[in-house]
């Protein structure tokens, strides 16, 4: 069962500013997560239904939320890991 992908408005703006190669890598990982979004190793602490995708080589993170009742994965924030900015942005949204 595949989940539908949606973006928060702020996350979509961040997504559009990404370099094409980074966006391509994230797209590939997102496609995998739409099939199975609940990855225990990627769960964010303090948020019951939020997970992350890491691009270790590029230093980027994507934070998403899973809504099982509607079969939706919502991208909350996309950005660099530096100084936890992507996690702070996700916490405020």
Task: Identify the function of each model-found stretch.
Residues 2-6, 10-17, 24, 38, ...:
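Enriched for short, Lys/Arg-rich terminal
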């Amino acid at each position: 069962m595949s989940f539908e992908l949606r973006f928060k408005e702020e996350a979509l703006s961040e997504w559009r500013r990404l370099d094409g190669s980074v966006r391509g890598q994230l797209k590939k990982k997102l496609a995998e997560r739409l099939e199975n979004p609940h990855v225990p190793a990627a769960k964010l602490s303090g948020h019951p239904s939020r997970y992350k995708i890491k691009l270790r080589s590029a230093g980027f993170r994507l934070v998403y939320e899973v809504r099982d009742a509607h079969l939706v994965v919502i991208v909350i924030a996309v950005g660099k890991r530096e100084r936890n900015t992507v996690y702070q942005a996700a916490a405020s949204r």
